[in-house]
């Protein structure tokens, strides 16, 4: 346990594998505990291309930003001290305490793991000084026995804090009893002794059918099952691109507007487009697929603009996109904005080797990568006159955040000094992530697309209930919260 944290409370949520629902469970617990306590989320190391920028310009995984929001506190870099952003070719950009540190292979990263260990200890200590409860999340499967000697996010966090542990398994994948039991058996003894409860997640159907299995699992492990969480559609931003596969092909079929988002190989921050799912059918189109007949096309952000531009061209998707030029809006966000330009000049910062690439040529910009520097900032911009799509909201403010390397020149900005539009105003690029979180932007885009089809705009379908309260209520209904409070040493929630 870290120094001077004897009076601080910790809870660690581990999983049997990736995508079992650890982040959602932590989010629910953060909202529940925040009713009576000052709570902070923590994940020592996150690997994700969906990230968030804090108010002081630090980059963290979006899951920890979501969890902080659920807890009612401001996200900070200490909540996710290490963020790994895969770039391809077994190399990731390492973000330490919200700042770009270096591009490293897995081997090089683990060679310096002791230094990283010190970073997370410092982050935890600072959180302990400010919060009275820290709800921590592991990564992937907890029982990665080949990594025990250098793991910082599961075994490392467990040993540093000596926290009570909840282990989560995903029944939707099948084999949940074996995965829970096997994970427990493979954990080191000093960690295994702190596993105080089990959760089965994403169950469809009547949980009564599981009762005999739950009883036997408890007898085999000596660990209580805290509950069975039902499968339901979360209304909080997704953590990583694995979640794209959860989006049904039938989602949004009842909407009149069809938006095609290009699923780049290294797609990042696709959460940008989830707000549009309340107003349109949003499809993620693989590079090898046909675009169909979209009302708008969006090229999203990417962790590696040059590599994904090459993939876009070689797959033929670039030509497919250009075939819609002048017919439907074509929007580019961050790396997608860079690809829409005339050219990209890379000194080796982005792609590893110096190169000059032709872009799609739909915007009059050139992007230059000449320094290992990243712009990370929250911004407020004013909508400028840029064409028919956003003409109805000219002069209004929009908020967003920037996460990018490279500098783009533009003679016709769209949002303050940001972005670029072509002469028709139908091709627009911007560095603003979170653009469609702005109600005025969503309404302007969807209204324009509906008007083109001779249809009337309808207000978006958003349930009245706060999505974090909704998730917390599902947890309260299906988990033994008294046991969870008890394992931490806290009084149950005051109702």
Curated annotation (Swiss-Prot):
Assigned keywords, A-Z: Cobalamin biosynthesis, Glutamine amidotransferase
Pfam families: CbiA, GATase_3
A Gene Ontology biological process term: cobalamin biosynthetic process
Gene Ontology molecular functions: ABC-type vitamin B12 transporter activity; catalytic activity
SUPFAM superfamilies: Class I glutamine amidotransferase-like, P-loop containing nucleoside triphosphate hydrolases
Active site: 334, 433
InterPro entries in the cross-refs: Class_I_gatase-like, CobQ/CobB/MinD/ParA_Nub-bd_dom, CobQ_GATase1, CobQ_N, CobQ_synth, GATase_3, P-loop_NTPase
Domain GATase cobBQ-type: 256-441
Its job: Catalyzes amidations at positions B, D, E, and G on adenosylcobyrinic A,C-diamide. NH(2) groups are provided by glutamine, and one molecule of ATP is hydrogenolyzed for each amidation.
UniProt protein name: Probable cobyric acid synthase
Species whose genome carries this gene: Methanococcoides burtonii (strain DSM 6242 / NBRC 107633 / OCM 468 / ACE-M)
Source species taxonomy: Archaea, Methanobacteriati, Methanobacteriota, Stenosarchaea group, Methanomicrobia
Gene (UniProt): cobQ
């Amino acid at each position: 346990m870290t120094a001077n944290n004897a009076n601080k409370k910790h809870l660690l949520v581990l999983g049997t594998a990736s995508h079992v629902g650890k982040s959602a469970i932590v989010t629910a617990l953060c909202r529940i505990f925040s009713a009576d306590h000052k709570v902070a989320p923590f994940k020592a190391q996150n690997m994700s291309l969906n990230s968030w920028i804090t108010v002081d310009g630090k980059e963290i995984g979006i899951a920890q930003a979501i969890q902080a929001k659920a807890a009612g506190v401001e996200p900070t870099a200490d909540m996710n001290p290490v963020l790994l952003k895969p770039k391809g070719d077994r190399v990731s950009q390492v973000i330490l305490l919200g700042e770009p540190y270096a591009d490293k292979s897995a081997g090089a990263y683990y060679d310096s793991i002791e230094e990283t260990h010190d970073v997370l200890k410092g982050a935890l200590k600072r959180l302990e000084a400010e919060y009275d409860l820290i709800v921590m999340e592991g990564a992937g499967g907890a029982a990665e026995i080949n990594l025990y000697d250098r793991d910082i996010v599961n075994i490392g966090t467990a040993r540093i804090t000596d926290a009570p542990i909840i282990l989560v398994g995903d029944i939707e994948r099948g084999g949940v009893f074996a995965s829970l039991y096997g994970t427990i058996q493979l954990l080191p003894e000093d960690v295994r002794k702190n596993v105080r409860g089990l959760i089965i997640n994403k169950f469809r159907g009547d949980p009564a059918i599981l009762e005999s299995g739950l009883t036997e699992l408890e007898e085999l492990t000596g660990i209580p099952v805290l509950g069975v969480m039902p499968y339901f559609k979360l209304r909080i931003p997704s953590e990583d691109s694995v979640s794209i596969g959860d989006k049904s092909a039938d989602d949004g079929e009842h909407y009149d507007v069809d938006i095609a988002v290009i699923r780049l190989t290294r797609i990042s921050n696709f959460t940008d487009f989830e707000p549009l799912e309340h107003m349109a059918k949003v499809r993620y189109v693989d590079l090898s697929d046909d675009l169909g007949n979209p009302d708008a096309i969006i090229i999203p952000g990417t962790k590696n603009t040059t590599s994904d531009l090459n993939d876009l061209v070689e797959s033929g998707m670039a030509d497919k996109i250009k075939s819609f030029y002048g017919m439907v809006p074509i929007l580019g966000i961050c790396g997608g904005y860079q690809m829409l330009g005339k050219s990209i000049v890379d000194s080796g910062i982005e792609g590893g080797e110096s190169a000059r690439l032709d872009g799609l040529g739909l915007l009059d910009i050139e992007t230059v990568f000449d320094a290992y520097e990243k712009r990370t900032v929250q911004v407020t911009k004013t909508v400028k006159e840029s064409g028919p799509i956003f003409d109805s909201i000219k002069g209004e403010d929009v908020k967003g955040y920037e996460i990018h390397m490279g500098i783009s020149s533009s003679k016709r900005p769209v949002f303050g000094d940001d972005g670029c539009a072509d002469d028709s105003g139908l091709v627009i690029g911007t560095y603003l992530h979170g653009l469609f979180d702005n109600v005025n932007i969503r309404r302007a885009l969807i209204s324009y697309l509906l008007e083109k089809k001779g249809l009337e705009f309808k207000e978006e379908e958003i349930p009245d209930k706060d999505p974090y309260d909704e998730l917390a209520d599902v947890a309260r209904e299906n988990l033994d919260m008294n046991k969870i409070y008890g394992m931490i040493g806290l009084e149950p929630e005051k109702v």
